[in-house]
Every structure is written in C-alpha cells, then in structure tokens.
Amino acid sequence: MYKRQSIYNGLKSAKQIAKDEKSIVLIHDGVRPLINEKVISDNIQSVIKYGSAITTAKVKETILVVNEGTATIDYVPSRNNSRVAKAPQSFWLDDILKAHEKALSEGEKNCIDSCTMMQRYGYDLYLIDGPGENIKITTPEDFYTMRAILEAKENEQIYGLE
C-alpha cells in the first residue's frame, strides 16, 4: 500500500508540473538499477503508439498456479504465453492518475502494481521485452548477481568482448 501511495503522490506532483496534456510517465522501481536507455526508449514509443508499456521478461522456469490454501497445483501455464512483469511500467499520465483515483475511491487493495491496476480498470496493456539483467536488488544474492553483471559489462568495455 505504501508503494502505491508513493506512486500516487508522484503522479499528482507530475500532473502539477506537466506542460502537455499528453504527458507520459514511466513508473520504475528504485530496486532495479540496471535499466538501460533502450528500455526507456521502447517504453516511451509503446505509450505513444499503444497507450501503455509493461516491461517484461520471458519466463525461464516453469510457473505453477496453485490452489489457494493447499499444496496442490491448479494448472501449469505455457511458458510461451507467460511473462514476468518488471519495470518500468509506462502510461499516459492522465490514464494512470484516473486509475489510482478510482482505486482509492473504491478502497481497492489487491492491485500489486500499476499494470495490475490498469488491467483491473479495463485499460489495454502492451508488452515490451526487457533485458534479463533488469533484476530487483532485494537480497544479498541479488546484489552478487548485479555485481557479476556489472563486471561482465566492464570487461566488455575494457576488452571489447561481446
């Protein structure tokens, strides 16, 4: 809930300073520091063309949808039709602000991120493929993974490796 309130506060501030009626916002997690210029550009272009952009990554492992309250599997979705939602998640400012205001007025508490909220309120969501290294850094293991990614990129720059 705190994250959503923080996003909403940021959206209200963005609305106050927006100069265009059609302003684009990219909502990004501070715990994803490995974002790159291409992801940002792809998000902006997708919003211009389709009205939204949800950065995703292809699923590499089997996803299990379980029956709530039990240790049983309800179904196994195809990897071909499954993606992991990441950030940034990007929209027209007015659209995402309206969705937040509707969620607040309804007392909605189940939307875990911006794309979940936008889908709940009937907006079409368009996906862009993001890089695998756009990971969340929330555990020591994530930190070491990030460090390895940065070292690999540094070696590419120093030694011209691809």
PLM regions and their residue ranges:
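Conserved strand-to-helix beginnings and helix N-cap segments that scaffold or border functional pockets
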Residues: I7-Y8, E37-I40, P140
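Hydrophobic helical membrane-anchoring modules
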Residues: N134-E162
